[in-house]
Amino acid sequence: MDRTETIVVGAGPAGLLAAREIARRGIEVRILEEHPVIGEPNHCAGLLSVEGLRRLGIDPSPGFVQHEITGGRIYSPSGASIEIAGSRTRAYAIDRAAFDRHLADAARGAGAEVETGRRIRGLLIRDGRVEGVRGRDAYAKVVVDAEGAAGSLAREAGLPPAAGLLAGVNVEVSGIDVEPHMVEVWLGDVLAPGLFAWVIPLGDGAARCGLACSSGDAFERLKRFLHRRFGSVRFSPPRRGLILTGGPIHRTYLDGLLVAGDAAGQTKPTTGGGVILGGICAIEAGRTAAEGVEADDPSAGFLKRYQRAWREALGREFASMLAARRLVNRLSDERIDRLFDAFRREGLEEKLRGLVDAGDMDMQSGVILAALRDPGLLGVLVRGAGRLALAELRALFNP
């Protein structure tokens, strides 16, 4: 019988960080990854904050950092823009495949076993308790499900699927004119319903461009955007993926099972980014899995400490970003254009820049709260979004 102390399903960042944490605590851990090469297929936009990497205990490495980002420019549907420029490096454009391999090396270095080309066909469940995985069956005291946005294992175990599923696509474009250290975010329901389009500079006139949407074909939408933004350009083959903006699932543990990362919906609802917040949660999952093995108690009653931990650390962040996402999703393109006009007309661009520059790319509740407390910004938001929508957002900070 194939048996180990813990199994992690999925060798993306969440799975690798969970495994690194388990191995550091001296507990056996085996990572099972369905694809033959870690980091492939790569369907991530590849933009990570400096502070986020620090939170995960990852030093920026030339092996995966492609370019430094200091700020961004946000565009309205009509093409008006607000610049959020900073004087320091705020984020890195990364090679996601190289980043994942970097994490895999760290997990192996801590003592984890990584097995690629291992397709999992389901969970081994007996008397309501997860005991391992099917497909060349393997048994473990605790299974960490970090399989990604599809979430099939969690659903098999009876947990709800993550909400806010969007189709995303990325391509790389060269020979274009872009600001070398400024990300572009393009809003609009006609362009990208449910999220936005993005341009991430990579240096030397190249950029990673992408789009995510809740309806229609994402690649067709992206091609129209590229033509609008750059004219006739050549681009790399598209890389498609799933993006989640609906917030975490309500329960992330069962007897013998922990769910982390995209599989648990632990992504930023505002942007769909999941590496940092999902990684923070995954480290908590690894810690709890190791403690469950040490205590010889993989019961739900013991493992629920994982959910308590990540909710205490990030619950307000997820809730505030989800409320902000729902508010933005209600806005028509015309309303967004009016908001941009009002920000410029009332001279609030500098104030908005200051809030965002002083804020945190991943822990966004501080920026949201500061905007709601500023009379000028609040007045514009009320006129643009409506009192009811903003009241729902403010209620998060006044329980």
Each model region followed by its residue ranges:
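Glycine-rich FAD pyrophosphate-binding loop
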Residues: 20-43
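Beta1/beta-strand and adjacent pyrophosphate-binding region of the FAD-binding site
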Residues: 1-14
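FAD/FMN-dependent oxidoreductases across multiple families
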Residues: 214-294, 300-301
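C-terminal helical "tail/cap" subdomain of flavin- and related membrane-associated enzymes
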Residues: 290-399
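A conserved beta-strand/loop capping segment in the N-terminal third of enzymes
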Residues: 50-102
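Predominantly flavin-linked oxidoreductase catalytic cores and closely associated redox partners
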Residues: 11, 25, 101, 106-236, ...
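Conserved N-terminal glycine-rich FAD pyrophosphate-binding loop of Rossmann-like flavoproteins
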Residues: 35-59
